[in-house]
Amino acid sequence: MNFILAVFAIILLQAVRGEIDNAIVGDPSVECGDDFFEVNIYHSCSCVGNFIIKVKFDTRTTFHGLAFVQNHLDNPDCRSFASKTDSAKNSSLRLTFDQCAIEKRHSTSPRGLFLSTNVVVAFNPEFLTKNDRVFKVQCFYMEMERRIQKVIQISMPPPTMHSKQLNMPVCKYEVLDGSPTGPPVYFATVGQMVYHKWTCDTEHENTFCMLVHSCFVDDGNGQRVQLLNDKGCALDKYLLTNLEYPTDLMAGREAHVYKYADRDNMYFDCQISITVKEPGLDYCDVPSCPDPPRRRRSNTLPAPDDNITAIAAHIEYEDSEIISDYIIPNDDIISLNWLQRNFDMRISELCMTAIGTTLLVFLNAFLFIISLVSIVHVCCFRTSPKLEKTKSTML
């Protein structure tokens, strides 16, 4: 009995040893096909097939193991089956694109598609041994680019550029006396009726439209009041009402002169937008504005003697208060004579025009010359008697 067991053990060890001693001889070769992967394990066999990938290698002895995709042994579609006969010389593993998580990777340089997977070759179907191998099987399918070119030489005349640039209108702002045709006003009294006029001149008629907006009045020291908003609508009817547009490139409105307390100069700052007139329109669109409200009245009255203000054609502002009761009717304004217009005496300063300043300079120069001549004459008169007295003594 013991003899039989010993013989059986020797036969079993020889069988196991034969499985373990089997190994792959040389380097496997890989061929890529069209539709699927197929991994063939041959024993000294060279075969040809129409497969995506075909791996061929030689083993020392007959192959009784199996081949499978790594990490997919439990999937029947991802492994080969062990041969049940001793006469089997090979085993095959057939894989399609959508099975066993075959990796697909696009390449841009070179352009194409990589298909790759890991195949484990086990010589024993039950366990792995040191003779087993893992192969990374990879196929590259290159994209072919064929560029078909045909040169056609066409001679065309160069395009002729016809361009014409319209000159933009030249705009100006004026403060006139009483009406759109009145003379310019540079010095005015509070309550005087003036006409604010914006005009633009252009060589091309019926081409442009204008919009006066964003108007401010400034005292020169940062105190600003807004008269027109960005749409061209008035904000205070006692300062300036909504503008009239008699023509496409003219806007204006009459208003009474007002001033800041303790300030003699006022600076007006407005923006004028020029747009191209729409074809077919007889008139330009003008802003549709509601009646402007009245601002809150100030508690500070201007000084009684500060009744003359200078107007400058500049443009900018912030909120200030004007008292409508301080506006003087136009009929009550008294015309100034020549001396009042050119020599305006005030408490804190002397304001004169260029003519008055010139006359004052000439007058001072004349008085200086008269004084100098008088001094020289007096000095000469006092020296003459002394000279005569000296001559008589010498005699």
Curated annotation (Swiss-Prot):
* Extracellular membrane side: 19-358
Q: Which residues form the signal peptide?
A: 1-18
| Ranges facing Cytoplasmic side | 380-395
Using the UniProt annotation, give the residues that carry a glycan (glycosylation sites).
N90, N307
Tell me where it resides.
Cell membrane
Q: Where is the ZP domain?
A: 46-291
Parts forming coiled coils:
none
Q: Where are the transmembrane segments?
A: 359-379
Supply the InterPro entries for this chain: CUT_N (IPR056953), Cuticlin (IPR051962), ZP_dom (IPR001507)
Major subcellular location class: membrane
Asked if Metal-binding is a keyword of the record, the answer is no
Give the GO cellular component terms, alphabetically: plasma membrane
Membrane topology designation: Single-pass type I membrane protein
> Which of UniProt's keywords are assigned here?
Cell membrane, Cuticle, Glycoprotein, Membrane, Signal, Transmembrane, Transmembrane helix
Phenotype on disruption? RNAi-mediated knockdown results in disrupted alae formation in L1 and dauer stage larvae with alae often present on only one side of the larvae.
- State a single Gene Ontology molecular function: structural constituent of cuticle
Question: What the protein does?
Answer: Plays a role in alae formation in L1 and dauer stage larvae.
Q: What is this protein called?
A: Cuticlin-5
Tell me what organism the protein belongs to: Caenorhabditis elegans
